[in-house]
Every structure is written in C-alpha cells, then in structure tokens.
Amino acid sequence: MRRWLIVLSTVLIAAATHTATDVAAPRAWAGDAPIGHIGDTLRVDTGTYVADVTVSSVAPCDPPPGFGYTRSGVPIKSFPGSTPNRADVTVRAVRVPNPFIMATAFSFTGVTPYADAYKPRTTDAPDDLDNVLVNAPNGAIVRGGVYWDAYRDPVSNVVLLDRKTGHHLAQWNL
C-alpha cells in the first residue's frame, strides 16, 4: 500500500511539472524596450502608436495641488527625508490614432535602488502629464510632470509601462 502511494504521488508530481512547462508563459517585453539615461530620447513603438519620450530630470518637490496625503513627517510610515518627487517628461507624438491614446496608455513608475516601485499620483497641477497628454495629436510636443510620493528611498529609475497590459515600454536610469 505504501509503495502505491509513493508511485501515485510521483506520477502526479511529474504530470503537474510537465503541464506547467507546456503552458505558454507571457512574453517578456523588457528585452524589447529601449533603456537609456536621464535626458535620452527613447522611441516607444507599440504598433498602435509611436512616440518619442524624454525624461529630463527627477527631483524632490513640494506637494502639488490635489496631491493628497503625504507620509513625510510621519515617523511610523516614512523614512527621514521622504518627500514627493517630480519627473519632467517631454512626449512627441509621432503617430497616434487619436489625441488621447497616450493619456490612457502611459504610466510612469518610479523605481528605487531596492526595487520599490512608486505609482504616479494624480494631481490638480496644470502641468501634470496626464492632463497635458489628453490632447496630443500627431506631431504635437507636450511637456509635463509625473509625481510620486517617495516615502522610502529616492527614485533611481523611471519605467514607462503600458497601463492596460503592464508591458515595459521604456526605461531611464538616473
């Protein structure tokens, strides 16, 4: 009886391993995404739209209007020196099917040296990148800011992700 139990468990484990290796893993797009340094203009081509994107700087800033709660100054939830960060981003729409496609697709994530990722915070600032990308027809050049609440470590990489699929579109290293 014990021998049959061992044989049965071995067969089940082998079948599960074989099934797991046959399942198609999602394609990793990070190898296809351009990687550059701050100030480099990177071409983002998804097949649906093409844009030239430049992240020119990342620096601490005062909280913009509508930023909401910040963790700075709260000893339990923040580290000393934590503050909102702002990235200056310039986007040139090379080929877009409609003027607002990049506003619905772009998500700039700030990543720390220890792999903490900060999602962009929506603000009421007039130069917020989400606000200016709403009207970016072919050939338009728009410039705006992306804001993060960097409550642990400072941002060392800016990663452009597709908001809908999560694909890695571009990356800038500081």
Task: Indicate residue ranges for each PLM-predicted region.
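Conserved functional micro-motifs across diverse proteins
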Residues: 7, 24-86, 92-174
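Secretory targeting and sorting signals
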Residues: 1-25
